[in-house]
Amino acid sequence: GEEVKWHQDIGFWPHTNYSPLTVGTYIYDCGMEQGPVGMIPKSHDGPLYNQYNDKDEWIGCLRPEDEAAIDTASADYLEGPAGSLTLHNCRMIHGSKPNLSDIGRPLLLNAYASADALPYTHNPAQSKYMETIVRGEAARWAHHDSRPCLLPPDWSVGYTSIFALQQEEA
């Protein structure tokens, strides 16, 4: 399997604040040979990066010059047996190395946000459970973070996958 290049999720589906997080569940055991997800520690507290190239095309990953400025050697790679969970904030820089094994590395991803985090754009990953409140009540007020967020392309006209975007297959 291909690598998943360094990226931040919030650029794919920006919200009024940065509460969204993703919980990943490894379906199979995932060791270094499978290319587990890697996270850059504390990057959720840093800047948001432009995930468009110089031609203003969405690439779904950090630009080479931004990646060069990040200490990717500090990444924590999250290995674990089947059923292990990964958890990351929408601003966290993360990705994975190529899968060098004959074993797949399926990772079930579920995204959650506080009820007062409203999406700015169409979500490309539609689900019958979208906007389901799993705890608490619907918000009466939106919480707006003062830090800006670059908007993605108009996903309502179609979306393939992060893999296709990053491999320039979109």
Language-model segment annotations:
Residues 14-16, 48, 96, 121:
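Active-site-proximal flexible loops/turns
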Residues 1-11:
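Short acidic (Asp/Glu) patches
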Residues 7, 14-32, 79-82, 87, ...:
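Short, conserved beta-strand element in jelly-roll/cupin
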Residues 30-97:
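Double-stranded beta-helix
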